[in-house]
């Protein structure tokens, strides 16, 4: 018998909470869970006892690493919340959660307003078309300034953001909020942990400011809604319901961002934030259709939510749970799925059985018999499904848009303390790289070293920490290494001829290949331009494969060769002695020969580095950036501090956190994201080649 859906789709919300590190995101989530009746005792992040931060590393560091998905209930609505990390090393977690959300709350610190990482996640949310509310948190903090935070939304994000609430007081005088639509004030009782408040008329000393803010709000909504504009111009009454409906529509269309105020820590304003989630953020029925592709025909398909449609879901996270093993978090876009049934992994084209289905509450779980359209849940039993895979009805395969996964930019060598731990290390690394596609582990074929690669030093620290805790592997980690690449800068042609015809079965392969530089980010492109069968068709894939394998080991210092086009245009073969293996070797020889005249260069990752520091340290900060081969691209004032935008090679950024701390007496902060690859200066290229043994010897 089919199970009954508990909440209709229009009363479902899938939301994320996103912010700069330390803006109070986890505390806000905590309070939402507390007021929706999910927790009985509030955990404070800075005491290491938060509900959402469930990995031991997160509780120790007071930061959120993995986006735990939690279900809460408010006013007859189901709200699925995904907690996202605010640290830039974990952008894949943010991308992942934004891909499966319908709406988001952006949390700002009332003292700092929009911070660098807020800008990053805001940009990502815009890319994925996610409607947002803004919660100006920490209104009780010294230096809290609601108007300043509003200004930063306009200046730094160019967001059409407008207050739907106004704070009453600030810092230790913060008492509550004024609802600028209903024109009522909500004053909190200090002793009741925010569970009780009085709704009263707007206090006299706020009446004038509140009325002006109310009028500004109506004007702002009129700018994005023709119906409100007509009434406004005619001087007609606009009802609260009409105003809310117009705000909802404009918010869902990404034309308007409602702003609310509060203090999660002091338990003020969280219930009104929940009301705004219900009032203004979309249900799965309100969002634009999801794009999918039919793998059989290649046709684009639009998916809309509905239980009566074939099942389609995206696996957006894989996690290893200490009690139930491998959990696959899924977002259901259409249809329903019962525990125990089969699904098709359309990405890998294989069938898998879903053993059990769980609804997650941070790290508690509740078994459920079935999931419905719009749900977020965790499945047990999917052995071959990885992040970004599409799971569909067996008879209706679809590929949903997958995630953009950035390549790792930093690597370190890792070796277990004892030989016995090697197997455990291998298992641990395999599991961690399944969970996190930006974390890669590989063995260097020449040295036998195990290398791990990721998005930053903190990312790798946490992975090594997890190996120790979850897989009981004690390991030594080497110095961080930069993930260099190589490329060609000139067009050239070369022959590769491999002949071995003395005794036994001979070998013969002969190719002429033209190499040209490709556009940045386009990768390797191979073209077969053979005419008249001078290289038989069955050997063409071997030529391409031989090039790929040789490119993986580079031509200068052993780093992968990228962004090159190769055109096979001539060659010869031997009726008896030619083989795939011979053409593979010939192709690698052509690459090696071409490298002498192709202007081969080593590329290094260039990071976009944003430093925020008080004005008085500006000279030191800029001096340090220049000393690290960096380019300052621009500066802007951030309150009484300065933000310095720069491009700096990753190789020069190791240990920068310590340098910045001491230069600014602990008051400077920075964020760093990968931007592009660039050729290293000649002198540094020579050093790298020398250090790596002067180029790679290809095996004959």
UniProtKB/Swiss-Prot annotation:
SUPFAM superfamilies for the chain: EF-G C-terminal domain-like, P-loop containing nucleoside triphosphate hydrolases, Ribosomal protein S5 domain 2-like, Translation proteins
Protein name: Elongation factor G
This protein's record includes keyword DNA-binding: no
CDD domains: EF-G, EFG_III, EFG_mtEFG1_IV, EFG_mtEFG_C, EFG_mtEFG_II
Gene Ontology molecular function terms on file: GTP binding; GTPase activity; translation elongation factor activity
Pfam families, A to Z: EF-G_D2, EFG_C, EFG_III, EFG_IV, GTP_EFTU
Coiled coil: none
Superkingdom to which the source organism belongs: Bacteria
Cellular compartments per GO CC: cytoplasm
PROSITE patterns: G_TR_1 (PS00301), G_TR_2 (PS51722)
Main location (coarse class): cytoplasm
KW Protein biosynthesis (keyword) present: yes
GO biological process: ribosome disassembly
Alphabetically ordered keywords of this record: Cytoplasm, Elongation factor, GTP-binding, Nucleotide-binding, Protein biosynthesis
Alphabetical list of InterPro entries matching this protein: EF-G-like_DII, EFG_II, EFG_III, EFG_III/V, EFG_IV, EFG_V, EFG_V-like, G_TR_CS
Localization (cell): Cytoplasm
Binding-site residues, GTP: 19-26, 83-87, 137-140
Family, as annotated: Belongs to the TRAFAC class translation factor GTPase superfamily. Classic translation factor GTPase family. EF-G/EF-2 subfamily.
Cited Gene3D superfamilies: 3.30.230.10, 3.30.70.240, Elongation Factor G (Translational Gtpase), domain 3, P-loop containing nucleotide triphosphate hydrolases, Translation factors
